[in-house]
Design a protein with these regions (language model features):
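Ordered, helix-dominated protein-protein interaction surfaces in large eukaryotic regulatory proteins
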Residues: 26, 64, 68, 77-85, ...
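Membrane-embedded catalytic cores of phosphoryl/pyrophosphoryl-handling enzymes
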Residues: 60, 97-191
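N-terminal transmembrane-helix/juxtamembrane module of multi-pass inner/ER membrane proteins
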Residues: 1-64, 74-95, 112-123, 127-131
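Generic local-structure boundary detector
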Residues: 30, 35, 39-43, 69, ...
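Hydrophobic alpha-helical transmembrane segments of polytopic
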Residues: 15-22, 65-69, 171, 175-178
Length: 191
């Protein structure tokens, strides 16, 4: 039986970093490419305003990024709701009671697969009781991997000006390690 832990990487941090870092990387990279005159395409007219090519590129890459994030989330949610694996802290959150009134600590229930039960923990919220069945695939892991791999691949394709190649590789490695840390934290949090 594993205890319930709050998430090491909270939802706020996950979405702030997951959306923020790739977007910052795209803005900075496209602006630098424009300043170094690597993209000398014509400007677009929009309601009488000239839209620089680097802003057009940002719009394109933001769209690709957000579409991919939505697809990743949809795929993860389909997996979560169709498989519905119990989280490792299921017993401490639910404290299941069998139809005969026994619980999991009763020796009669050892080494039995039990499908019919009710949760006896009155203190658990409806949200927590719902989430105890949504262990796999990990939403935190899939979202962080998608966003950070996208950022790393984006930098690989677009950050190709002369200068330090080590900076690009350091940023790519840092992005991937942040996603890896998030995935590992789900294991240590028993999520």
């Amino acid at each position: 039986m594993h205890p319930f832990h709050e998430s090491t990487v909270t939802h706020d941090v996950l979405y702030s970093v997951g959306f923020g870092l790739p977007i910052i990387a795209m803005v900075v990279t496209e602006f630098i490419r424009w300043k170094l005159s690597m993209d000398n395409e014509r400007e677009l007219k929009f309601y009488g305003y000239d839209i620089p090519f680097w802003v057009q590129n940002l719009y394109k890459y933001f769209g690709i990024f957000l579409f991919g994030a939505a697809c990743s989330q949809l795929t993860t949610d389909i997996g979560k709701y169709s498989i519905g694996r119990l989280r490792p802290h299921f017993i401490s959150v639910c404290q299941p009671i069998m139809p005969d009134g026994t619980n999991c600590s009763n020796p009669i229930n050892f080494h039995r697969y039990i499908e019919v039960f009710t949760c006896g923990n009155e203190e658990s919220s409806k949200r927590r009781l719902k989430e105890m069945r949504l262990s796999f695939p990990s939403g935190h892991s899939s979202f962080s991997m998608y966003t950070m791999v996208f950022a790393a691949l984006y930098l690989h394709c677009r950050m190709n000006w002369k200068g330090s190649k080590l900076l690009k590789h350091f940023l790519q490695f840092s992005f991937i390690m942040m996603a890896w840390y998030t995935a590992l934290s789900r294991i240590s949090d028993y999520k």
